[in-house]
Amino acid sequence: MITRLSTLFLRTLREDPADAEVPSHKLLVRAGYIRRVAPGVYSWLPLGLRALRNIEQVVREEMDAIGGQELLFPGLLPREPYETTQRWTEYGDSLFRLKDRKGADYLLGPTHEEMFASTVKDLYSSYKDFPVTLYQIQTKYRDEERPRAGILRGREFVMKDSYSFDMTDAGLEESYARHRAAYQRIFDRLGIEYVICKATSGAMGGSASEEFLAVSANGEDTFVRATDGDFAANVEAVVTQPGQERPIEGLPEAVVHETPVSETIETLVAWANSIGVTVDGREVQASDTLKCIVVKTREPGAEEWELTGVLVPGDREVDMKRLEASLEPAEVELAVEADFAKYPFLVKGYVGPVGLARNGVRVLADPRVVTGTSWITGADEKERHVVGLVAGRDFTPDGFIEAAEIREGDPAPEGQGTLTLARGIEIGHIFQLGRKYTEAFDVQILDENGKRAIPTMGSYGIGVSRLLAVLAEQRHDEAGLNWSPAVAPYQVHVVAANKDAAAIEAAERYATELSQAGIDVLFDDRPKVSPGVKFKDAELLGMPFALILGRGYADGTVELRVRGGEKTELPVDEAVETIVRLVNEARG
């Protein structure tokens, strides 16, 4: 296929769009791949659509290879299936809801577990029909509170979601393993640098869950890796090693002190050391203090907010993402001034677990807050703290919670050294859902003994449109994009940079011969555009190979440019053969 730039629907830009913050957003707009329609909503222009279709094809090939069968559900869905699983309320404000002219409730699909489960129920009834894997590549909708970074975090996006149905848990594990391997092949073929991380299941439910994160400094997700092992996890899924329980007998009684200048952890530690408080024979450190963070939570469908106290060691900050993941599907917000005014027992800066428990507030503690540990914390009175408050004696948490920040150098699980932190972009997520959705829809199948059984599900998602932005993040330089051959809209960009008639005719011939060899060609045949502009556009658009017919053509040579790599002079009669070989090698 040959596409001529003289007729291609394209306008490149020299300046970054005003609302763009990350490289992928800037370059995809400047290069004419996408165009903003509304916050978080983008049009796909011809070049962008070709690249998107190439990604879809790689995904489709690998899904078909593991026995997946493609179908397509509507994006406009009725309320009832999502009421059955309670996700009509659990999704909260992120769900696009609408009514038809008769007043019936509908939604724009954020994900389709309900549709897959109910369809299998309607069509299959015997164990002989299983296992089965179904998938679709389809547009999804989520009302992101803060859409950002172009198509990295949009409100409309293309996703591949697949679902496996097995009669046994062992079968689910096999389906999960097949999808995991297929995802690795997909991301390897696309040329993405990624990490497989342990993850939380969130609103999806289920047991085992892993994320595929593309390594990127601009990623919204933080993940950790062990220095001496293969452990990797999204920071939300990191489990804190519990503290060592201690005997309570013999510990000194808790004492309340006046602390007029100790509203911060730093001043509290300084005060404690100034009056000679010690811990195990040493000076007090921030980790000996206990922060009591007050948050409010609201369960799906509820109108009222409820207070919750979150206890973390004073040397740690609360990580809101970890906190939200631990309390999901409830909404979570930090308590604000109005809440402190509403509840007089909340003394800002001096809240402690005793006062919260006394007033019926749920208290959740960091796993390090175990029986026998002694703390310095708020005494629930202005300018007062308590020293020697012992867990299991003076207060007992209602449960434990993963809410404290994870830091570089924290111990890794199972003795795998320490943790290092990095940023990433979620590109895939796989779940062993189990029977949450098949039970909700009463999917009953007759097993080989003629008894009714409920199949188990796996759920597997890939952010297809996000992959284009991820590749742009990972594969670009100051001049522009640098696509891998599997994704590039065209493999070769032929540039006629010489106005000599013979050179222009040769460029036409090269484009035709490359096309006949099965290579997609973008041909810059624009007659009134300078060579300099053509070269800049070629670098901005980012095709893997560029064939330049310039001044050297009269001397029997053309120039081959590998995007982001070498420039080579080739004899005119060897150009096509060389490029075909290089493209085929790059395709693998």
UniProtKB/Swiss-Prot annotation:
Biological process terms in GO annotation: prolyl-tRNA aminoacylation
Enzyme class: ligase
Entry EC number(s): 6.1.1.15
CDD domains documented for this protein: ProRS_anticodon_short (cd00861), ProRS_core_prok (cd00779)
Xref: PROSITE patterns: AA_TRNA_LIGASE_II
Pfam families the record matches: HGTP_anticodon, tRNA-synt_2b, tRNA_edit
Primary site of residence: cytoplasm
Membrane-crossing residue ranges in chain numbering: none
Reactions accelerated catalytically: tRNA(Pro) + L-proline + ATP = L-prolyl-tRNA(Pro) + AMP + diphosphate
Coiled coil stretches, renumbered: none
UniProt KW keywords: Aminoacyl-tRNA synthetase, ATP-binding, Cytoplasm, Ligase, Nucleotide-binding, Protein biosynthesis
UniProt GO molecular function: aminoacyl-tRNA deacylase activity; ATP binding; proline-tRNA ligase activity
Compartmental location: Cytoplasm
GO CC entries: cytosol
Family that this chain belongs to: Belongs to the class-II aminoacyl-tRNA synthetase family. ProS type 1 subfamily.
Subunit organization: Homodimer.
Function: Catalyzes the attachment of proline to tRNA(Pro) in a two-step reaction: proline is first activated by ATP to form Pro-AMP and then transferred to the acceptor end of tRNA(Pro). As ProRS can inadvertently accommodate and process non-cognate amino acids such as alanine and cysteine, to avoid such errors it has two additional distinct editing activities against alanine. One activity is designated as 'pretransfer' editing and involves the tRNA(Pro)-independent hydrolysis of activated Ala-AMP.
Domain notes: Consists of three domains: the N-terminal catalytic domain, the editing domain and the C-terminal anticodon-binding domain.
Name by which UniProt lists this protein: Proline--tRNA ligase
Species the sequence originates in: Corynebacterium efficiens (strain DSM 44549 / YS-314 / AJ 12310 / JCM 11189 / NBRC 100395)
Name of the encoding gene: proS
